[in-house]
């Protein structure tokens, strides 16, 4: 009987060791497959500690709300940007689309320059401009096989030209609807309305990426376009759709940025491109395609905005902020993207 008890004890020990080993393996697998997001979260935690030490205001509720307000526009843009990058392409038209859509929207809304308010119809018109530029980019890229870098650079200037034409060297139009102008900064459940809008767009992007044929198809195209095409994936249609979505979201971002500013400007999207693309790369979205995700890119946006906000509150001289931001950005990109260096190739 003692032998039987001893045998059962040994079996239980072996079972426990197997379970412990399996548990350890699953933890290692989780860390390996989520290396980029975990690196981002760790980096943000380090930044919070450093900037919180340098300036206690950094960790205040008011500053948190300010950060969430600041990330709203790039969060919307990065959803479309990520979809394009996932298939191994690039979209540089962001600033032009934002300028065109933003100027169109404010000139068709209550403003100080024109008596041309068409109410809610200003939204579909402005979004339609973004969609149109996105479709133009997508068709030229997918149908005519013009490299995405070249064609989106061209449509950037198309959008910028539309914005400048609407501006017309006149006074910048100012939004006269005060309730609408205050909407982005108003709080719902303690958070800015603009952030809730951006969060809804990010959630939609995540759902599309994980639960639709389009989302899975874009990753397949980025991994191997020939195999994707031979597997029955409508590559051309998906490419056009990705740029159309990116254009529409850039248009929405242009409208939101215009409301936040309270006036229209052809340069409303200035600098956004140099936030969203590094954010996507930091988040683990490979420029060669086939890897990454919307949520990862969103974390990348948060990291960059937190970094910029922290530098301001830390009292870094404005003349040196760009240099410091750029240096830290390079270090962060290298730290996060180095494990994927074999996939960081020039976009098609």
Which residue ranges define each predicted feature?
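Membrane-embedded helix boundary and interhelical linker motif in transport proteins
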Residues: 84-136
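Cytosolic-side transmembrane-helix boundaries in multi-pass membrane proteins
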Residues: 1-49, 230-237, 309-348
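Structural signal for alpha-helical transmembrane segments and their membrane-water exit/capping regions
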Residues: 43-59, 87, 163-172, 206-213, ...
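Transmembrane helix-bundle core of multi-pass membrane transporters
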Residues: 144, 148-212, 238-241, 260-269, ...
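Hydrophobic alpha-helical transmembrane segments
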Residues: 37-42, 67, 74-75, 96-100, ...
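Helix-loop-helix "hairpin" substructures at the membrane interface of multi-pass membrane proteins
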Residues: 118-126, 133-137, 189-264
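Transmembrane alpha-helical segments in multi-pass inner-membrane proteins
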Residues: 250, 260-326
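Hydrophobic alpha-helical segments embedded in the membrane of multi-pass proteins
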Residues: 70-81, 100, 132, 154-157, ...
């Amino acid at each position: 009987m003692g032998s039987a008890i001893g045998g059962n004890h040994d079996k239980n020990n072996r079972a426990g060791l197997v379970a412990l080993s399996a548990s350890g393996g699953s933890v290692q697998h989780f860390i390996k497959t989520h290396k980029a997001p975990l690196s981002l979260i760790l980096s943000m935690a380090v930044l919070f500690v450093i900037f919180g030490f340098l300036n206690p205001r950094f960790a205040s509720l008011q500053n948190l709300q300010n950060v969430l307000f600041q990330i709203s526009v790039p969060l919307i843009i990065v959803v479309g940007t990520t979809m394009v990058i996932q298939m191994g392409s690039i979209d540089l038209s962001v600033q032009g689309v934002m300028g065109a859509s933003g100027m169109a929207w404010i000139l068709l809304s209550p403003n100080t320059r024109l008596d041309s308010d068409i109410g809610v119809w200003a939204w579909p018109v402005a979004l339609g401009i973004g969609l149109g530029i996105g479709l133009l980019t997508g068709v030229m890229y997918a149908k005519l096989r013009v490299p995405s870098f070249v064609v989106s650079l061209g449509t950037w200037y198309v959008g910028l030209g539309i914005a400048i034409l609407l501006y017309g060297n006149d006074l910048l139009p100012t939004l006269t609807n005060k309730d609408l102008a205050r909407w982005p900064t108003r709080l719902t459940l303690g958070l800015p309305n603009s952030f809730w809008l951006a969060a809804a767009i990010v959630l939609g992007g995540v759902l599309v990426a994980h639960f639709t044929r389009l989302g899975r198809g874009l990753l397949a195209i980025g991994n191997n376009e020939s195999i994707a095409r031979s597997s029955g994936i409508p590559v051309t249609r998906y490419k056009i759709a990705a740029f159309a979505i990116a254009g529409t979201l850039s248009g929405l971002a242009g409208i939101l940025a215009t409301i936040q500013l309270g006036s229209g400007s052809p340069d409303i999207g200035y600098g956004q491109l140099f936030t969203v693309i590094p954010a996507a790369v930091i988040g683990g979205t490979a420029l060669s395609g086939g890897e990454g995700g919307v949520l990862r890119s969103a974390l990348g946006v948060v990291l960059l905005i937190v970094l910029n906000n922290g530098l301001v509150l830390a009292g870094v001289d404005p003349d040196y902020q760009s240099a410091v931001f750029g240096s830290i950005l390079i270090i962060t990109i290298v730290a996060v993207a180095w494990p994927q260096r074999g996939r960081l190739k020039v976009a098609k």
